[in-house]
């Protein structure tokens, strides 16, 4: 679920969203893209006739942008509650499962010639399927918007206080809740009221660049700071839980290879949130030069592999800097007066601020298609939906105590739905029994994959609700 996780949906043309002519549905079996009856003397159009112009490398870059998101900030926290080896093993499992999930999507797309995640839902489950898929994508994007605004709430007061040489907890105009409202009204809302994305679509490249800068800075600061636990004033004290000392759970600079506590059940949801890119896979497939299922799977594997390395390095060096005291929003751990980290904060704030309206566009579009499918464009409705969404997300961010809860809930609901459950349902319903019998090994695998997603969702939500009910979320949370 990625800083640019929704961008591809909005940039698609009507065909890419499945708005195909009626006779096109009858021709879906002929190729990945529908074609009309050829004129006399012309050969029928095939998939290669609609070949995209995007190179393999650029497709990898685009999909990496779709994967990369705010979830990277919470991975060191996840490692602190599982240990280095267990975390890396779980991260590898999520990466491999994401790759298999994309394999299922590409197989379904090849069978029916549909290029949008929502349209696969309609083909598999009828109109209700399209509604369910659109609702899940909207939920995930609302979660992504919330995580971006929470970063603004957490980091902007530190940036302003640094420039003004003030205590970030001192004056009223440095309160995070007030600042996210100001940013939403003055910057995000005007951008969200645009009818088209325009140059906002290029913020995806900015987001990946900022996160690469963040990774390099995390590695550099580890070697510069050494051990920060308990005695190094560079680390910012945790303010979300006054009862916690700065040294947190571990009083020494000793890395844990394996560990377990009540917070470890946030680990896999945070990882799942960090790997969601599935609604963008088919649009990127459409634009791929010399498209084929094998070539697009290679794009996905390279992108996921690159993000696995980037996530693993960020989590490892972040954890080895702060150990068990690391917070769910790792950037908040560094000193507000550190010049390098100040530059990182500015870059991340710029990226997430410009990405919020990009994520809002497909949510509004989905709501309009579901609630007002036959209505012409209306400025009052266009503005009202944007206002309602921004108010809803602002209230959510103000009320939620930590970004970990956002990562946890979205990573336990929409993420397993998009990665595990829906692709397996699509495969079971769309791939005909003549091609793959119901009791064939591929369909049994897909069924087990979907069941795994349901179990993952139920277990993660169950433990999180238990934590909230017992108050452990606040006692142990950062």
UniProtKB/Swiss-Prot annotation:
UniProt cross-references to Pfam families, sorted A to Z: Aa_trans (PF01490)
InterPro entries, sorted: AA_transpt_TM
Entry's localization field: Cell membrane
Region feature (Disordered): 1-20
Membrane-side (Extracellular) residue stretches: 81-93, 153-172, 220-263, 323-340, 404-405, 467-478
Catalytic activity: L-serine(out) + Na(+)(out) + H(+)(in) = L-serine(in) + Na(+)(in) + H(+)(out); L-alanine(out) + Na(+)(out) + H(+)(in) = L-alanine(in) + Na(+)(in) + H(+)(out); glycine(out) + Na(+)(out) + H(+)(in) = glycine(in) + Na(+)(in) + H(+)(out); L-glutamine(out) + Na(+)(out) + H(+)(in) = L-glutamine(in) + Na(+)(in) + H(+)(out)
Membrane topology: Multi-pass membrane protein
Regulation: Not inhibited by lithium. Partial allosteric regulation on ions sodium binding.
Highest taxon above the source species: Eukaryota
Signal peptide: none
Listed GO MF terms: glycine transmembrane transporter activity; L-glutamine transmembrane transporter activity; L-glutamine, sodium:proton antiporter activity; neutral amino acid, sodium:proton antiporter activity
Disulfide bond entries: 227-253
Glycosylation sites: 232
GO CC terms: plasma membrane
Biological process according to GO: amino acid export across plasma membrane; amino acid import across plasma membrane; glutamine transport; glycine transport; L-glutamine import across plasma membrane; L-histidine transmembrane transport; L-serine import across plasma membrane; neutral amino acid transport
The family this protein is said to belong to: Belongs to the amino acid/polyamine transporter 2 family.
Its biological purpose: Symporter that cotransports neutral amino acids and sodium ions, coupled to an H(+) antiporter activity. Releases L-glutamine and glycine from astroglial cells and may participate in the glutamate/GABA-glutamine cycle and the NMDA receptors activation. In addition contributes significantly to L-glutamine uptake in retina, namely in ganglion and Mueller cells and, therefore participates in the retinal glutamate-glutamine cycle. The transport activity is pH sensitive, Li(+) tolerant, bidirectional and associated with large uncoupled fluxes of protons.
Record-given protein name: Sodium-coupled neutral amino acid transporter 5
Annotated organism of origin: Bos taurus (Bovine)
Gene: SLC38A5
């Amino acid at each position: 679920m990625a800083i640019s996780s929704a961008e591809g949906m909005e940039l698609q043309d009507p065909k890419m969203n499945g708005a195909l002519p009626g006779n096109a549905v009858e021709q879906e079996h002929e190729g990945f893209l529908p074609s009309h009856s050829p004129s006399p003397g012309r050969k029928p159009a095939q998939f290669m006739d609609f070949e995209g112009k995007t190179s393999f490398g650029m497709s990898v870059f685009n999909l990496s942008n779709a994967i990369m998101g705010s979830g990277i900030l919470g991975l060191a926290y996840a490692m602190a509650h599982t240990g280095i080896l267990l975390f890396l093993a779980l991260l590898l499992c999520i990466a491999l499962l994401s790759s298999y999930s994309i394999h299922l999507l590409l197989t379904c797309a090849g069978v029916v010639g549909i290029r949008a995640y929502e349209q696969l839902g309609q083909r598999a489950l009828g109109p209700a399927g399209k509604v369910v898929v659109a609702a899940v994508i909207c939920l995930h994007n609302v979660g992504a918007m919330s995580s971006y605004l929470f970063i603004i709430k957490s980091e902007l007061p530190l940036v302003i206080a640094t420039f003004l040489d003030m205590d970030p907890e001192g004056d009223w105009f440095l309160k995070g809740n007030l600042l996210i409202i100001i940013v939403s009204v003055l910057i995000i809302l005007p951008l969200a009221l645009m009818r088209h994305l325009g140059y906002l679509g290029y913020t995806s490249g900015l987001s990946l660049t900022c996160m690469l800068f963040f990774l390099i800075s995390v590695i550099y600061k580890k070697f510069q700071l050494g051990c920060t636990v308990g005695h190094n004033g560079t680390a910012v004290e945790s303010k979300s839980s006054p009862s916690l000392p700065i040294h947190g759970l571990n009083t020494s600079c000793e890395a844990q290879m394996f560990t377990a506590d009540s917070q470890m059940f946030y680990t896999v949801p945070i990882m799942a949130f960090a790997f969601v890119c599935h609604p963008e896979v088919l649009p990127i497939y459409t634009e791929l030069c010399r498209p084929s299922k094998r070539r697009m799977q290679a794009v996905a594997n390279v992108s996921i592999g690159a993000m696995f390395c980037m996530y693993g390095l960020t989590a490892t060096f972040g954890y080895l800097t702060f150990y068990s005291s690391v917070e769910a929003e790792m950037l908040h751990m560094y000193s507000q007066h550190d010049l390098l980290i100040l530059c990182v904060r500015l870059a991340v704030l710029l990226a997430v601020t410009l990405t919020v309206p990009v994520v809002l566009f497909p949510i509004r579009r989905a709501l309009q298609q579901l609630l007002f499918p036959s209505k012409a464009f209306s400025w009052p409705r266009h503005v009202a939906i944007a206002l309602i969404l921004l108010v809803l997300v602002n209230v959510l961010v103000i009320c939620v105590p930590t970004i970990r809860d956002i990562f946890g809930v979205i990573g336990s609901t929409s993420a397993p739905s998009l990665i595990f459950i829906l692709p397996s349902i699509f495969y079971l319903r769309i791939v005909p029994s003549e091609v793959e019998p119901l009791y064939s090994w591929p369909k049994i695998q897909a069924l087990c994959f979907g069941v795994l997603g349901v179990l993952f969702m139920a277990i993660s939500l169950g433990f999180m609700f238990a934590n909230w009910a017992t108050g452990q979320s606040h006692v142990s949370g950062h």
